[in-house]
């Protein structure tokens, strides 16, 4: 997200008369800690993510649209991080608000995907702002080159304990 935020800011400098929105959908189902980590993208050379939405808090689509409109009115491009599991007040996942085929995994769980695309389409249709949706999906699971020393150590220890328990 740091790289994405930085690139988005560079585009903003070149194209400030026409704000754009990039919505990144991050895995996590009902736990938003990965999405919350998007706040860590802020640094001295990068403003970071503008808006972050987690599944632990009810998603208010009207408030979301108002915030996007407010930021866009300043002529700024923006980056928004949303958890795949964000839900509206009636308990439905945001992606369920779109007209799509519903998928379930081998365990019968709803396959969570499409919140970013739904929101991008809504922003484009209602606010006329160029918007992109990015669903990292499998890519975020396969980024072993980004693994921290802590992650490697914990995975090694858990694997060792599993072998001993078997």
What do the PLM-derived regions correspond to, one by one?
Residues 1-13:
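Single conserved hydrophobic/aromatic residue that forms the stacking wall/gate
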């Amino acid at each position: 997200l740091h790289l994405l935020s930085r690139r988005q800011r560079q585009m903003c400098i070149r194209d400030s008369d026409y704000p754009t929105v990039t919505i990144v959908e991050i895995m996590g189902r009902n736990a938003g800690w990965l999405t919350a980590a998007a706040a860590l993208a802020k640094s001295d050379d990068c403003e970071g993510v503008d808006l972050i939405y987690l599944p632990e808090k009810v998603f208010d689509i009207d408030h979301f649209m108002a915030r996007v409109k407010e930021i866009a009115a300043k002529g700024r491009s923006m980056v928004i991080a949303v958890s795949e599991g964000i839900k509206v007040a009636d308990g439905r996942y945001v992606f369920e608000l779109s007209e799509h085929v519903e998928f379930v995994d081998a365990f019968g769980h709803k396959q969570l995907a499409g919140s970013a695309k739904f929101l991008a389409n809504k922003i484009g249709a209602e606010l006329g702002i160029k918007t992109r949706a990015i669903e990292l999906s499998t890519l975020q699971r396969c980024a072993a080159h980004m693994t921290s020393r802590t992650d490697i150590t914990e995975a090694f220890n858990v694997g060792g304990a599993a072998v001993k328990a078997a």
